[in-house]
């Protein structure tokens, strides 16, 4: 891919993701806002991630909870932000999303502020059946940590820094 195409892809991606904050404000009352944001993040217009899970690690309550899941074969066929009721119904029927949401365990002990035990993470990856898994963690509100486990995209068109920076948007979503 030539340099101009990479720049075009980055401009398109950042334009797409830039709209997310506007949509998040418009739909702030939705309990499942994290599903909307995750869908945006992983879609063809986003980072083209085939399978991903968003979890919250809460050391204060010794709890690790699955919040939202995305799996490309179960993708919503319309525009999620323009069809919020249909999207919400769709996600309630999404087997992978429900599988992620059903995940509950004790809190992951942090080796450092950004690193969890590979053994602990591998158990989650196996449960979620994510191939060629990568993960990223970040500090969230109320002393929680966000945990994003995803299947590495085949075509890495944009910098992972963009992905990791955008993941913080999930911290603004309610956990339901």
Can you describe what each PLM-predicted range is?
Residues 1-33:
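Signal-transmission linkers at sensory-effector interfaces
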Residues 19, 59, 112-115, 172:
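Terminal helices and disordered tails flanking the catalytic cores of nucleotide-processing hydrolases
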Residues 21, 37-45, 170-174:
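Hydrophobic, Leu/Ile/Phe/Ala-enriched alpha-helical segments that form helix-helix packing faces
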Residues 74-137:
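Regulatory sensory and allosteric helical modules in signal-transduction proteins
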Residues 26-76:
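Helix-loop-beta substructure at the N-terminus of cytosolic sensory domains
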Residues 12, 120-123, 165:
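Exposed alpha-helical structural elements
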Residues 1-6, 131-138, 146-176:
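Regulatory loop-to-helix N-cap segments in sensory/regulatory domains
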